[in-house]
């Protein structure tokens, strides 16, 4: 559940400028870059070590990775606390018409940013939702025969960088995007992001989209580009393939066979006073990254602007977010890698494209290579399910 938000005219004019104009404004007289930064990682395809295969690049060289300190119960930002994409992420309330109403206190969503006034984060009568704002950023992903690359920049450093995570349906690059703080609950047939609610369940993709759209035309599923962008930032910050080890397991094993306990799915809001990032090394508690709960574990999440059409991965850089893949661009055909039928396993070999990373072999483990499981059915047309649930997160 997300939406693109608008920038003021000054920001839009800057963002819409062509690449040469942007770079010219960031260059010294000798042509060297003055303000542009790039934080990147290189992943060695032949190294199975979840940490050893990842190397820092460009401005990230020498930085200390971020990670939870499970002993102290604190999040250690390492060298990343003042990086632009961390500083420009904040919790807020967004009205049904898509305008930002006010910011929340980062350490207690029950309060507005002034630290005194009560917020509407748990108010079911509020005409809007609790959201996490992500501003700016350009992302570059590619591979060579031996390595994969993920690079973030504050500018469009070259033509290999895109900002599809903040591109509106009309193709205009906006200042940023909002992602729901909480897994949506269903209130009066509207999918809402509010604290203290039980997430909706047992809905198909069309039903979910109907309930999300009931907020207003500007509301939509979280897109593949938004989800991929956040995962890329987390990998860069932590310098590891194992995000659960770095940020928290999430509710990956809290399932109970009891409908009165919602089968172990947690109510929203348990992380309201935990700050921007927080997690546990237990397997039945919530996870929060970039002010958004349940990025993995607890409950599967559907995302839009990607479809696997009988084994062919298709993406939509921007547009109507349809669920069929109509008008989407082909990125990868699993058949080219000998993958067909219904398959699954821990990811090992992957292909890094400009649209993201896709696994093509599944003989890894929970502690090697990507450390995550993958399922695929090349016989159907479907949007992705990401993050896992409380029985297999």
Language-model segment annotations:
Residues 12-13, 49-50, 186, 392-393:
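Short, surface-exposed beta-strand/loop "edge" segments at domain boundaries and coil↔beta transitions
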Residues 23, 27-188, 215-225, 230, ...:
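Extended N-terminal export/anchoring regions of large proteins
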Residues 1-30:
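Short, low-complexity N-terminal tether/leader segments at secretion or assembly junctions of large
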Residues 39-45, 226-228, 252-263, 271-272, ...:
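C-terminal, surface-exposed recognition/capping segments
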Residues 309-320:
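A short, polar/charged loop-to-alpha-helix boundary motif
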Residues 119-121, 125-128, 157-295:
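Short aromatic-cysteine micro-motif
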Residues 6, 17, 136-139, 181, ...:
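Hydrophobic side chains in beta-strands
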